[in-house]
């Protein structure tokens, strides 16, 4: 879980464009965030398995 101070810091507008970074919209995790969904891999997998993301399903081959 992300610290509240880091989440608040991330929500401010960055002074320079290179300082901006992505965080998960659900848990605030800074790493392995999918930009298309705005979710980290953990939350993306959980929501996909619960059927909360339309059109996404578990792969099987």
Curated annotation (Swiss-Prot):
The UniProt entry, under Gene3D superfamilies, shows: 30s Ribosomal Protein S14, Chain N (4.10.830.10)
Pfam family example for this protein? Ribosomal_S14
Q: What are the GO MF terms of this UniProt record? A: rRNA binding; structural constituent of ribosome; zinc ion binding
Q: Name one GO cellular component term.
A: small ribosomal subunit
Keyword Ribosomal protein annotated: yes
Q: Name one GO biological process term.
A: translation
Q: Which cofactor does it need?
A: Zn(2+)
Q: Can you quote the record's cofactor note?
A: Binds 1 zinc ion per subunit.
Keyword set, alphabetical order: Metal-binding, Ribonucleoprotein, Ribosomal protein, RNA-binding, rRNA-binding, Zinc
> Span of the secretion signal?
none
Residue positions annotated to bind Zn(2+) are: 24, 27, 40, 43
Does Transmembrane show up as a keyword for this record?
Answer: no
Q: Which PANTHER family match?
A: 30S RIBOSOMAL PROTEIN S14, SMALL RIBOSOMAL SUBUNIT PROTEIN US14M
Q: Which family does it belong to?
A: Belongs to the universal ribosomal protein uS14 family. Zinc-binding uS14 subfamily.
The record's note on quaternary structure and interaction partners says: Part of the 30S ribosomal subunit. Contacts proteins S3 and S10.
Q: What name appears for this protein in its UniProt entry?
A: Small ribosomal subunit protein uS14
Which species is this record about? Answer: Sulfurovum sp. (strain NBC37-1)
